[in-house]
Amino acid sequence: MALDPKTAALALHRFGFGPRAGAIAEIASDPRGALIAELDRADAGQIAAADLVTSGGAVRAVFEWNAERLARDKLARQRREAAQRGEGGDPQAAPAMEAKPPAQAPNQGQEPPLPRQIFLKEAKARFDAAVGAEIGFVERLVWFWSNHFCVNADSSVMAGGYEREAIRAHVLGRFADMLLAAESHPAMLIYLNNEQSIGPTSVAGINRDRGLNENLAREILELHTLGVRTVYTQADVTNFAKVITG
């Protein structure tokens, strides 16, 4: 087959992350076939890293870490108060315990907080997947759909797990499957406040003076599926929120 470096360069730029050294020559004989081959890989779009945890595992780990941190802080506070009262120790120890440490960079010599550690591992795995991609066709699809079904990485330790479990798992499958996985994932439910949505006539809604939260329903209709210029109404949003809330 004749070499077609121009089409190869176009394929790498338009569908991937651009050409690596020697990449144009590698696929010049069949640029289209190279793209299809990346789609056909059994592990296309997947990330396999032993130190990554599921969304549920991340939440449990952070819950336990936070409980231990609060317990340590409480114990330290009790010891300071006891020392200040002269109980169980040298009263002169209190001022020393309260003395400020030497000025240094925040967290110098310490591990980052657990949520930060989880984020950094997820970010590195995502970066490595992009760098290691031969072309990057599938990885760009992952990025597109992660942006379409976005959640807030700043406020959720589940963001990395969400991308792996809802987006990567369905990136080459049916849109309906990805839609269901994304909208029902805890990261999305929390991001769009659906955990706060309560049936207004339910016992819980009446006792707590709470009602429906329409954020998720509106986002699904307005941004994730139909779009802003379609014919759904406010009544559709409200009824959809009722269905989602149960």
Walk through the language-model features, giving the residues of each.
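Mature N-terminal segment immediately following signal peptide/propeptide cleavage
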Residues: 7-19
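Alpha-helical structural elements
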Residues: 10, 58-60, 140
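Primarily short, surface-exposed interaction patches in extracytoplasmic proteins
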Residues: 1-4, 19-29, 35-36, 117-246
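Short linear motifs at secondary-structure transitions and domain/linker junctions
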Residues: 13, 105, 119-121
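Active-site-surrounding "flap" and adjacent substrate/cofactor-binding loops of secreted or lumenal enzymes
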Residues: 5-6, 21-117, 202, 206-210
